[in-house]
């Protein structure tokens, strides 16, 4: 029962519940004999010597008027030990004639012990949930599964050898108060942690949740399309009964040491890139954004600056962005002149003129594959797209 104890809230709940069973005052004492719950609020905090007798002798103690006069903080009544898993965790006392109360004592005690057991189980469930969340937070940072992580997982009944892929749920909690946002997050967490899903979920903050999903299907294969459908179904389902607006990004599936950490990084970057490129969308997938996600790690480094140089030259002479939009459309339509000109509502000669102008300004030959690739990569890195 490590971490659990009979506290004042639990004691007062027991008093409220049991006083509905029997019309007499009820006291609840902790394992030190102090009154921590009572129908007579003035008695809370007093040391109850009758409870000390119960705690020391481990049995029911009747207190009549004669005995009560010789004990501190005691009135006539019956005092029973409260046991949890065979251990005495407190005492419950009923005030009144012992002879009249004896037949109710066991019933009241049984009710109190059932409440204690329920409280302990809730505590264990909450503790288990916190430990699982901490494990998830460690796994998304770990480059390998250390013996300590493996032992931690085993104690929680989690198999770290099960392949997993990471999804990130980013929540817009700005429209809700803190309490409401947390309640909605916990509702979402509960929906994601049902046993049949076998997900590991951690609430990182009021705006982010991490989900470690089993990666392989029933045939032992990675099926990105199946995961896509599941994410889309989740978003549809949560729209029906939740107030939260949220986005989901799904990272890539990796194998080997540090696979979960790598999957988390791809999910994180997929979210960032997805919001930049498709702000109206609610779900983003690594497979759809693979190149810009992989290139994002270069951002800020000298390699990215070199790759961006041709496009930077184009920008200086393309104030209204017309040539860049033309270039992006050309690549989007697989460098096919007819499809590109139709999409832009321009004549093919106009398209050819613009492409020639782009070649002049960038110093690159758009008929050369390597030069095309340089410009395409530069566009992928361009934050002004």
From Swiss-Prot:
GO molecular function: DNA-binding transcription factor activity
Species assigned in the record: Escherichia coli (strain K12)
Gene3D superfamilies: PucR C-terminal helix-turn-helix domain
Keywords: Transcription, Transcription regulation
Keyword Transcription regulation: yes
Protein name: Carbohydrate diacid regulator
Record family assignment: Belongs to the CdaR family.
Keyword Transcription regulation: yes
Role of this protein: Seems to regulate the expression of the operons for the enzymes involved in D-galactarate, D-glucarate and D-glycerate utilization.
Biological-process GO terms, alphabetical: positive regulation of DNA-templated transcription
Source superkingdom: Bacteria
Recorded consequence of changing residue 292 to S: In strain: JA176; unable to grow on galactarate, glucarate and glycerate
